[in-house]
């Protein structure tokens, strides 16, 4: 090697492998090994992270040895080139001494230093976490199930009884920890894909979170030893599912053909007597018998001339039901919101202007009504001031205006109260639901005969399959018995030939059954279990529109 090549080799920087940056890993390891509270056992997640960092530091040792081996070869080649070019024997001896010194001192010293760095974090972890005497050469020996409990007590690993109150975890014992069954609890997004595969000892790892695909929450209790007292038997479970998976029969067709008359549900019963909250039954009976509401008078009585203030609390002088309702509709109804919204002008001015405007409106409307009525027919004689005549005149006027239809109203059977209005609204909704049920019943009635035919086809197929299976079992059983005995070939052939025609006839019957009837149910045989869409989709859309219209 020339002097220029030698200078170039000396000036070339040495490539330090990535594993030599062990100080960063040591800092990470120290940060993980520190516990918040002294004397508290860290969680299993922290322990596994510590072991993972230790494994990465220990793996640095082979790469360090490889690095020094390469440097040694470079130095030896450099020394050999110096020996060839140098003519001075003393310089050769100096170079050889330099190589020997580097071999003995520098290389071994560096390797020992790196080994001590990789071993010191492990000792510090055991001192901080376990705080118990170190088990000699426990990491080199195989851990058997017999000494798992001993190691658990010596290392003070977290178990269910200790971590259940502190960390909320449900780890069982040290065996689960050592076998790696708890690794799935510590893998998070901070690990790379290769680290996850290496940590879990698998060839592949799911790239997305698949916990949403798990059927429910996994059970964390131990059911291997103690059986729950309230566990439901399997027979009870099957019997509860039987009504949903049973076969159809003729009773189902008869049930669908039988209609349900719900017309009586739309009739609103007449109003009954008033309720009196009286405890003695005799007093209630007497009071109801003498009550004025038992035979309620709906006709107008009395006249305006004989009307005084004392008649307001009795039924001797009263207006007709139409007049009472019309007057009740003209009375203003004040609510709490109306009281809060006070007018900005004075109350007296507001009352005067309001009353004046109302009087003017009422006067003009009455004049218009009277003038309009004179155009059609003559009004009845109203010289008498009887309330019944006022009732008839009011009814006549409302009919002329088109507000009141022709026909007499039976006021004793009125149904315009709040309860009757609610009943009519519910009856309208009930009618919509009844129409929907009727359409669904007709749809099921049309599909049920085809389903029962396919059900019969499957039953016959299952029966033929069972007969063929029983024939084969019987044939094989007879052959096993014949093999145990010493028989001639003639006897064996006769035994097999006797069962063959039975099996052949069953197979022919099955093939003929499939050939004749399978094309009729090809769609049902090829489709998956269950229908992809509901058979009531069209009905539900139509019913929803009708329901919204009625409401």
Swiss-Prot record:
| Ranges where the record places region Disordered | 106-144, 351-383
* Keyword Coiled coil annotated: yes
User: What domain of life?
Assistant: Eukaryota
GO process terms (BP):
regulation of transcription by RNA polymerase II; transcription initiation-coupled chromatin remodeling
Positions modified as Phosphoserine?
Answer: 120, 144
Write out the biased-composition intervals (Basic and acidic residues): 106-117, 125-142
Keywords associated with the record: Chromatin regulator, Coiled coil, Nucleus, Phosphoprotein, Transcription, Transcription regulation
Q: What Gene Ontology terms describe what this protein does at the molecular function level?
A: transcription coactivator activity
* Coiled-coil portions: 417-476
Subunit structure as annotated in this protein's UniProt entry: Component of the 1.8 MDa SAGA (Spt-Ada-Gcn5 acetyltransferase) complex, which is composed of 19 subunits tra1, spt7, taf5, ngg1/ada3, sgf73, spt20, spt8, taf12, taf6, hfi1/ada1, ubp8, gcn5, ada2, spt3, sgf29, taf10, taf9, sgf11 and sus1.
For this entry, the protein name equals SAGA complex subunit Ngg1
- From which source organism is this entry? Schizosaccharomyces pombe (strain 972 / ATCC 24843) (Fission yeast)
Name of the gene: ngg1
